Amino acid sequence: MKYRLILATTGCVLFITVMAGVSWVEAEPQDFSKVPVKGMVTMIDLGAKKRIPCKMMAPIMEKMEKVYRGKAAIVFIDVWENREQAGRFRISSIPTQIFFDPEGKEVYRHVGFMGEEAIVAQLKSMGVE
């Protein structure tokens, strides 16, 4: 199965920035090795397409993609379809959002629905305007 990759998440499909200026890229699941994106603040949202909180976050993530394109990578990983990623990122509940600095170091972790204001505030605290 192929996944859509982009700078931010929309809905609950995998989206990732591989490099500034790239909007859409097709990739296989092994490309999760590029997450977190080196050299860029990265937000990973781990959840499942069929979960209500993911569906609620979809329009927020669409907006985040537009606002932060080229400034931050916002990645969604469906852990029901990619169970190994749940272990890799040590999650015990979904949704979980993890923020990484440009060096790939985890800076902040949140469990549960995360609204737009909270996402914007966290990105801003990490220097992303």
Question: Model-flagged regions — what are they?
Answer:
Residues 55-67:
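Typically the conserved alpha-helix immediately C-terminal to a functionally engaged Cys/Sec
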Residues 39-42, 46-50, 93:
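Short pre-active-site segment immediately N-terminal to redox-active cysteine/selenocysteine motifs
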Residues 101-129:
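Non-catalytic, surface beta->alpha helical segment in thiol-disulfide oxidoreductase systems
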Residues 46, 65, 70-83:
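Thiol-based oxidoreductase modules, predominantly thioredoxin-like and allied folds used
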Residues 1-27, 129:
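N-terminal targeting signals for export/organelle localization
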